[in-house]
Amino acid sequence: SVAGRAQGM
């Protein structure tokens, strides 16, 4: 999801 991309995972 977008939440993972916010941390760069």
Curated annotation (Swiss-Prot):
It comes from the Eukaryota. One of its GO terms (cellular component) is extracellular space. It is found in: Secreted, Extracellular space. Keywords: Antimicrobial, Plant defense, Secreted. Found in the liquid endosperm contained in green fruit of coconut palms, also known as coconut water (at protein level). Transmembrane segments: none annotated. Coiled coil: none annotated. GO terms for biological process: defense response to Gram-negative bacterium; defense response to Gram-positive bacterium. Has antimicrobial activity against Gram-positive bacteria B.subtilis (MIC=76 ug/ml) and S.aureus (MIC=80 ug/ml), and against Gram-negative bacteria E.coli (MIC=82 ug/ml) and P.aeruginosa (MIC=79 ug/ml). Monomer. This is Antimicrobial peptide 1. It comes from Cocos nucifera (Coconut palm).
